[in-house]
UniProtKB/Swiss-Prot annotation:
Region (Disordered): 44-68
Record PTM Phosphoserine, positions in chain: S7, S11
Modified residues (Phosphothreonine): T21
Cited function: Alters the structure of the nuclear envelope by interacting with host CBX5 and disrupting CBX5 association with LBR. Involved in the perinuclear-nuclear localization of the capsid protein VP1 during virion assembly and maturation. Plays an important role in the release of progeny virions from infected cells and in viral propagation, probably by acting as a viral ionic channel in the host plasma membrane. Allows influx of extracellular calcium ions in the host cell. May contribute to viral genome transcription and translation of viral late proteins.
Organism per entry: Simian virus 12 (strain wt100)
Record's bilayer topology term: Single-pass type II membrane protein
Protein name per its UniProtKB record: Agnoprotein
Amino acid sequence: MVLRQLSRQASVKVGKTWTGTKRRAQRIFIFILELLLDFCRGEDSVDGKKKKDSLTDKTETVTEKKES
């Protein structure tokens, strides 16, 4: 009987720590995904402003030249 109680208590402790570990891992994973998303969008992580993309600037000028 005592062994059964001890094993249940141990499994509860392991379950709680595993839940905390999963939550922490999920938070880290979400942070990395958001960081990658910001990087792919071209936003600067320091001030949140978009960086100028030279490729889009070039395509805009080429498009403007074709229209006129």
